[in-house]
């Protein structure tokens, strides 16, 4: 009797958790769609005087990046809190209670589905095969996290990469508004973008694979089964290869801007010297 009661309670809790996840994913999807189609138009026109002068294509990308920034700040900050204070997943990174992390993962999943639709419906404007690969890899991993309760800590750790997106998007906003490349705001944002991207997307790579190596073959790892083990490794490799490619591109751009600034300063010094 007691065993059957516990089983019933466990089943009920799991069903409630599943409903909560589905509701969060759907709510997230709807909210980010509303942000893209309505809120960003209204908000951007009031915050930036240059928004109304942009072409329709530019406005579409602008709005998608506003949504991206909102998502990144939301899941990034919440993810950072969970990374330091969610005792359940910190204590057991492989099978710890994913209740709070699931909220973050479900929110991110709703955004990824929303953004995939936006990209597909506006392919000629913002279509990018790398974003499709990135989103599909993320959704695949999140599906298994949300349905099995495994690897919640790792999934949340990967979400911290979103903390770099606001700086990447801000660079695009400056470019769309035709801010001078050497303006103080542009240069500071560029440096911050490079540093933050490196910290949350590149420095985090070695610890991730060291942890994978340390748990490989253990009983909790074996419990995953072949499918989850494969998804963990394959999706991480795909995302990390893309992050390294983007990091190289960002670093080259940052070095180029810094070298041009030095050249401009050297010219100014030379001109001042001649004038003196």
Swiss-Prot record:
Predominant place of localization: membrane
Subcellular location: Membrane
Modified residues (N6-acetyllysine): 178
The TLC domain, residue ranges: 57-259
Keyword Acetylation: yes
A GO CC annotation given for this chain: membrane
InterPro entries, A to Z: TLC-dom (IPR006634), TLCD (IPR050846)
Keywords: Acetylation, Membrane, Transmembrane, Transmembrane helix
Topological relation to the membrane, as annotated: Multi-pass membrane protein
Record field: transmembrane: 20-40, 66-86, 101-121, 130-150, 191-211, 224-244
Record family assignment: Belongs to the TLCD4 family.
Name listed for the protein in its UniProt record: TLC domain-containing protein 4
Designated gene of the protein: Tlcd4
